[in-house]
Amino acid sequence: MKIKDAKKPSFPWFGMDIGGTLVKLSYFEPIDITAEEEQEEVESLKSIRKYLTSNVAYGSTGIRDVHLELKDLTLFGRRGNLHFIRFPTQDLPTFIQMGRDKNFSTLQTVLCATGGGAYKFEKDFRTIGNLHLHKLDELDCLVKGLLYIDSVSFNGQAECYYFANASEPERCQKMPFNLDDPYPLLVVNIGSGVSILAVHSKDNYKRVTGTSLGGGTFLGLCSLLTGCESFEEALEMASKGDSTQADKLVRDIYGGDYERFGLPGWAVASSFGNMIYKEKRESVSKEDLARATLVTITNNIGSVARMCAVNEKINRVVFVGNFLRVNTLSMKLLAYALDYWSKGQLKALFLEHEGYFGAVGALLGLPNFS
């Protein structure tokens, strides 16, 4: 995908996606700076570049996902590396204060942002950091960022992948998928909630539907049920649990399969259905509850996605969003569910930069405001 470079914005180049739970930041680090440019570069710009590229953690909660860095790409006619940084939305005031401390506002830079937080925190950027946000539509940014990242390739690796043999856990393996001809595509964006888009071309897409039961629901319920303190802790607990201790299965009701309607005995008939029994509540572990929560949320997303794919007549479904970060368990569940219930007609696809497409899409909007 070619990005116009007629109008080059002044450095630094950022794109922000301020979500309900996480802030995602894409930062372009130029590597083709001339001696003349370096001489003229103001101290505050050097300070920001050095701070962002020489650290992998910022404060107690900010993290640069080093493994996702895109090296030596060309953007707006400049060569550089693209960095990906995330931190909790509740820590955004600290980020704004850091920008103020590093004299960010003196650089006359353009700050493009998307996500609900671009509206919610606009006043804070202005009053605390003396910064003006240019707000961009989050679904536009999601689609543009996704198509751009897939087009530049992941340092020679495939950006897109799927799970082969999804129905056989011992043979299931991650495999690259060629997305050179991406249309049509159903994009399922799983953040705090879920949005589902039907993409027919780079300019022709629509939001089909969504659900409030997303990553925020998983972490919220897990925190209530298990006392976990973080997404990573919730996933760790889920990986050790058995959801069938909490869920009521078809076989618990029918004694086996419900053959007339093609329902296998292992299918979930009622999520958390076993928790109506006192003895079951007393024997279930926190790990079981975490696993059941993950399975409940993931199965619901998969079910809604499958219905949308059938209605829109699209057979490739790409799942993105930070709910899938370090969450191979859910990815394999989604891959299996789509393959099984569609009788092999639907393919679940995933992307390495799962949660950063909105931030990249915002970055791509820079020339429009320079």
Curated annotation (Swiss-Prot):
<comment type="similarity">
    <text>Belongs to the type II pantothenate kinase family.</text>
</comment>
<dbReference type="InterPro" id="IPR043129">
    <property type="entry name" value="ATPase_NBD"/>
</dbReference>
<keyword id="KW-0963">Cytoplasm</keyword>
<feature type="binding site">
    <location>
        <position position="195"/>
    </location>
    <ligand>
        <name>acetyl-CoA</name>
    </ligand>
</feature>
<feature type="binding site">
    <location>
        <position position="207"/>
    </location>
    <ligand>
        <name>acetyl-CoA</name>
    </ligand>
</feature>
<feature type="active site" description="Proton acceptor">
    <location>
        <position position="138"/>
    </location>
</feature>
<dbReference type="GO" id="GO:0042803">
    <property type="term" value="F:protein homodimerization activity"/>
</dbReference>
<dbReference type="GO" id="GO:0015937">
    <property type="term" value="P:coenzyme A biosynthetic process"/>
</dbReference>
<dbReference type="GO" id="GO:0019842">
    <property type="term" value="F:vitamin binding"/>
</dbReference>
<keyword id="KW-0547">Nucleotide-binding</keyword>
<dbReference type="GO" id="GO:0005829">
    <property type="term" value="C:cytosol"/>
</dbReference>
<dbReference type="GO" id="GO:0005634">
    <property type="term" value="C:nucleus"/>
</dbReference>
<comment type="subunit">
    <text>Homodimer.</text>
</comment>
<protein>
    <recommendedName>
        <fullName>Pantothenate kinase 3</fullName>
        <ecNumber>2.7.1.33</ecNumber>
    </recommendedName>
</protein>
<dbReference type="GO" id="GO:0004594">
    <property type="term" value="F:pantothenate kinase activity"/>
</dbReference>
<dbReference type="GO" id="GO:0005524">
    <property type="term" value="F:ATP binding"/>
</dbReference>
<keyword id="KW-0173">Coenzyme A biosynthesis</keyword>
<dbReference type="InterPro" id="IPR004567">
    <property type="entry name" value="Type_II_PanK"/>
</dbReference>
<keyword id="KW-0418">Kinase</keyword>
<dbReference type="Pfam" id="PF03630">
    <property type="entry name" value="Fumble"/>
</dbReference>
<feature type="binding site">
    <location>
        <position position="192"/>
    </location>
    <ligand>
        <name>acetyl-CoA</name>
    </ligand>
</feature>
<dbReference type="GO" id="GO:0016310">
    <property type="term" value="P:phosphorylation"/>
</dbReference>
<comment type="function">
    <text>Catalyzes the phosphorylation of pantothenate to generate 4'-phosphopantothenate in the first and rate-determining step of coenzyme A (CoA) synthesis.</text>
</comment>
<keyword id="KW-0808">Transferase</keyword>
<comment type="pathway">
    <text>Cofactor biosynthesis; coenzyme A biosynthesis; CoA from (R)-pantothenate: step 1/5.</text>
</comment>
<dbReference type="GO" id="GO:1905502">
    <property type="term" value="F:acetyl-CoA binding"/>
</dbReference>
<keyword id="KW-0067">ATP-binding</keyword>
